[in-house]
Amino acid sequence: MNANELTIAEARDALAKGELSAVDLTMACLTAIDAGTPLNAFVHATPEIALDQARAADARRGAEAGALNGIPLGIKDLFCTRGVASQAASNILRGFKPEYESTVTSKLFEAGAVMLGKLNMDEFAMGSSNETSCYGDAVNPWKVDDRRLTPGGSSGGSAAAVAADLCLAATGTDTGGSIRQPAAFTGIVGIKPTYGRVSRWGIVAFASSLDQAGPMTKSVRDAAILLGAMAGHDPKDSTSADIPVPDFEAALTGDIRGRKIGIPREYRMEGMPAEIEALWARGREMLADAGAEIVDISLPHTKYALPAYYVIAPAEASSNLARYDGVRYGHRARLGQGDGIVDMYEKTRAEGFGKEVQRRVMIGTYVLSAGFYDAYYNRARKVRALIKRDFDEAFAAGVDAILTPATPSSAFGLGEMADADPVAMYLNDVFTVTVNLAGLPGISVPVGLDAKGLPLGLQLIGRPWDEAGLLNHAHVLERAAGFVEKPRKWW
């Protein structure tokens, strides 16, 4: 086994025992990144920074070493990293190098982590297939025939990099499923924490009331370790919760006897593939075998989640993206003689934003406009409150976690949705958006393969602030499923 194939927990133990140095571990990952160029997962590799941090980690070994000392990670391009290109996969931020570090990356570096570079993603996190990126598509390391498959989105580069062992783990962000859907498509673990658990400061904003950063890892234990380092109150983020961060790893007892697992009847969608239905049934059996009580629940407003999400998210995006005007940073269009300031704004935004981002900004501006604010935006906010109430009532009735499919299918081919109605792509988020609208924690766990040999995941949804309990349920599911398959190396 090469060092880059280790989990965080395994590498941590090997580093502590002196069986492995952080420099050797980092070099193994950098070699894998070079070989993994066809995956287009890393878009800004930072080998010099990585090796400097690895040498510092080796020098620090011992008592004062942090929880992630010497662990090489990939960072989604949405996180601002000081002096390193951070452009949210958009041409409008081409050449932008922040003067500051995001809170999440600061915390990771304080814990001793090594940054291997920045990862591909959908432009401004708007997409479910990593096809809206200015860097080109990220490619799923899993393959069927000779088709190039999507790794999912928007955290597609993060998912591909972890699944292909280019790094030990990666950061992602999740606005409507952008950690959980790519994790399911690539056979890895991805957790979206409770809204406010992880600081959003220094993360390029898409939809401020929905965005949440989280870890993408090779195991549930790794997710617990990485989340522990990322989470915590941040006075720089007004939505960050001042709540103590428990020891997530210590919560992985594997004991869920007597816990109630809710199965929402509304998630049985018309036309859902039989494989997904069978996987969900298997997940129920695994949790029941571990001593959990399986109960049917109702989340009656589920069917309104996608339309509500695709009003609220674009509305917030159109407001957040108004700042990209070519004045202070990023791309500025070349102006003709006699062009004024309005021409500069229009040309800059037309050249800098990709088609999907333009579409969502237009939708968002429309639903916030005077004549339509009540008809669309306010109605969507009311629906959101009802969706949250559905979950609150389920948890108040004693449910500890909710089990659902993570995605409506396995990974699809790159370019397959290119000519489809955009709504067909939006349907990828059908099982995940409710969790963001309600601000709850959700985790995707790989449980099996479909008939084509592609990974499928199940989603567990937890009570607010109970990531510890959620991770423990996921740990039980992971152990019972025994998913150890890896993509066959073709790159």
Curated annotation (Swiss-Prot):
PROSITE patterns from the UniProt entry:
AMIDASES
From which domain of life does this come? Bacteria
Q: Where is the active site?
A: K76, S154, S178
Q: What is its EC number?
A: 6.3.5.7
Catalysed reactions listed for this entry: L-glutamyl-tRNA(Gln) + L-glutamine + ATP + H2O = L-glutaminyl-tRNA(Gln) + L-glutamate + ADP + phosphate + H(+)
Q: Which Gene3D superfamilies match?
A: Amidase signature (AS) domain (3.90.1300.10)
Which cellular component terms (GO) are annotated to the entry? Answer: glutamyl-tRNA(Gln) amidotransferase complex
Tell me which UniProt keywords the record has, alphabetically. ATP-binding, Ligase, Nucleotide-binding, Protein biosynthesis
Q: What does this protein do?
A: Allows the formation of correctly charged Gln-tRNA(Gln) through the transamidation of misacylated Glu-tRNA(Gln) in organisms which lack glutaminyl-tRNA synthetase. The reaction takes place in the presence of glutamine and ATP through an activated gamma-phospho-Glu-tRNA(Gln).
Q: What is this protein called?
A: Glutamyl-tRNA(Gln) amidotransferase subunit A
Give the originating organism: Cereibacter sphaeroides (strain KD131 / KCTC 12085)
Which lineage do the record's taxonomy fields give for this organism? Bacteria, Pseudomonadati, Pseudomonadota, Alphaproteobacteria, Rhodobacterales
What gene name is listed for this protein?
gatA
